Amino acid sequence: SSDVCSSDLVRGWLEVKGWAYKDFGTNSAASVDYPDYAHPLALAVESGECYPGIAICGSGNGINMTLNKHQGIRAALCWNAEIAHLARQHNDANILVMPGRFISTEEADMILTEFFSTQFEGGRHQNRIDKIPVK
């Protein structure tokens, strides 16, 4: 429906900002397997081809879990602007995941704005991030 977050909304938001982006799909209403889209996105962010990444899924959980299987990825499931702010400020999230079925277009706009305008704080948060990879 028109009141939920969609990839069209995100593409439009990025275009209004004048930012280049790479669209990994999906571009249809057909049911798809989220790992088929999560892995290429994660690889692009890990390699530096894209930064940051944005993913939208029904609840956001499945694609978020898949993205976070990649060592260099810190995907954050954000359903409001405050969560998006903290994901960037404290966790240096490099992929924003939004639960498309559960947020409105207005909420998505606020989340995107907050995620892209917040800088990583570093300091004690960097020490914690350094402990994330399994060694």
Feature roles, as predicted:
Residues 7, 38, 63-64, 84, ...:
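A general structural signal for well-ordered alpha-helical segments in protein cores
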Residues 19-31:
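A short beta-strand-loop structural module common to alpha/beta enzyme folds
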Residues 1-6:
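Short, small-residue-biased leader/transition segments that mark boundaries at the very start
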Residues 35-39, 79-80:
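Charged helix-capping and loop-helix junction motifs
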Residues 12-20:
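Short helix-loop-beta junction
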Residues 55-101:
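Mid-chain, well-packed structural core segment of small domains
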Residues 37-59:
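Short, structured active-site "lid" loops
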Residues 81-127:
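Short, glycine-/small-residue-rich phosphate/pyrophosphate-handling segment
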